[in-house]
Curated annotation (Swiss-Prot):
GO MF annotation, one: cholest-5-ene-3-beta,7-alpha-diol 3-beta-dehydrogenase activity
Keywords: Endoplasmic reticulum, Lipid metabolism, Membrane, NAD, Oxidoreductase, Steroidogenesis, Transmembrane, Transmembrane helix
Record-level GO BP terms: B cell chemotaxis; bile acid metabolic process; cholesterol catabolic process; liver regeneration; regulation of cell growth; steroid biosynthetic process
Gene name as annotated: Hsd3b7
Annotated tissue distribution: High levels in liver and lung, moderate levels in spleen, brain, heart, kidney, jejunum and testis. Up-regulated in 3Y1 cells upon growth arrest.
Protein name listed in UniProt: 3 beta-hydroxysteroid dehydrogenase type 7
Annotated pathway: Lipid metabolism; steroid biosynthesis
Length: 338
């Protein structure tokens, strides 16, 4: 007779499971969580690759739904033991209205929390965003900071504002009716003069570890913030991107910016004005705006070992392997574009 401790019994729900991070979490759960009985993938748009996952020993259930619809979230969650909430609307260019961003990121998160209370699901891992911390509108640097580093978080852009509000909801809900909403994870994909990046596989791996350890270490991990980090080098946007683009034949020309900073500021102001004037007529979403310029020109790096101390996190992928995998992905994307 099999040891009951080894019988797969857990049901996981991953919201936004077809997104870039969500897909990595889904695939990694199937590979690394031996207690998994059913994996529910909840997303507004379901991907075709889900079908290939349905042939394995774990039941993979694809659920098309919208986090802004409370009844759909509750129905998907019923009977789940662990929820990993990655669903969200990332928009720093103004493609979506502030109201839509708030509805998805804030109300959607509230719906997930309410569904946890309604269904008795005790464990929630929430994916936040580094933009919640900064860079702020004043352009203050965040140099080798950790989860406890004082930093004046001032936001005006709808996206970081929405993620900050959503994170606050999760923090306030922790411990409510015995619930453990913990391990809020930041995706470290910020800013420029010197920036800290992290490979998506290591971000997914940290989610797996938090979800696995949260119940046993609830007193320590519940309601905590964890920056995700690995051994990726601190470099500017351009220099870091060239780590992956150089093998594809691209070269970075020059050692100084093509345009002076004051001119970039002027251009962002002009773009913001045009976006406001044209909004009633046409959707104008320039890549360069005041927010993206501030992000790209503010040092933002992380140096912490909190996740290792709390639940034994170590990067699953080395920098060399992360770089090789990313180059392969870029080359595959390049090939599919032709």
């Amino acid at each position: 007779m099999a040891d009951s401790a080894q019988v797969p019994a857990l049901v996981y729900l991953v919201t936004g499971g077809c997104g870039f991070l969500g897909e990595h979490i889904v695939r990694m759960l199937l590979e690394w969580e031996p207690r998994l009985r059913e994996l529910r993938v909840f997303d507004l748009h379901l991907s075709s690759w889900l079908e290939e996952l349905k042939t394995g020993p774990v039941q993979v259930t694809a659920i098309q739904g919208d986090v802004t619809q409370a009844h759909e979230v509750a129905a998907a969650m019923a009977g789940s033991h662990v929820v990993i909430h990655t669903a969200g609307l990332v928009d720093v260019f103004g493609k979506a209205s502030p109201e839509t961003i708030h509805k998805v990121n804030v109300q959607g998160t509230q719906n997930v929390i309410d569904a946890c209370v309604q269904t008795g699901t005790r464990l929630l891992v929430y994916t936040s965003s580094m933009e919640v911390v900064g860079p702020n509108v004043k352009g203050h640097p965040f140099y080798r900071g950790n989860e406890d580093t004082p930093y004046e978080a001032i936001h005006r852009h709808p996206y970081p504002c929405s993620k900050a509000l959503a994170e606050q909801l999760v923090l306030e809900a922790n411990g409510r009716k015995g619930l453990r909403f913990g391990g809020r994870l930041f995706r470290a994909i910020p800013a420029s003069v010197e920036h800290g990046r992290v490979y998506v596989g290591n971000v997914a791996w940290m989610h797996i570890l938090v979800a696995r350890e949260l119940e046993q270490r609830a007193a320590l991990m519940g309601g905590q913030v964890y920056f995700c980090y690995d051994k990726s080098p601190y470099k500017s946007y351009e220099d870091f991107n060239m780590e992956f683009l150089s093998p594809c034949g691209l070269r970075l020309i020059g050692t100084h910016p093509l345009l002076p900073y004051w001119l970039l500021v002027l251009l962002t102001a002009l773009n913001a004005l045009l976006q406001w004037l044209l909004r009633p007529l046409v959707l104008y979403t320039p890549l360069l705006n005041p927010y993206t310029l501030a992000v790209a020109n503010t040092t933002f790096t992380v140096s912490t070992n909190k996740a290792q101390r709390h639940f034994g996190y170590k990067p699953l992928f080395s920098w060399e392997e992360s770089r090789a995998r990313t180059i392969h992905w870029v080359q595959a994307m390049e090939g599919s574009a032709w």
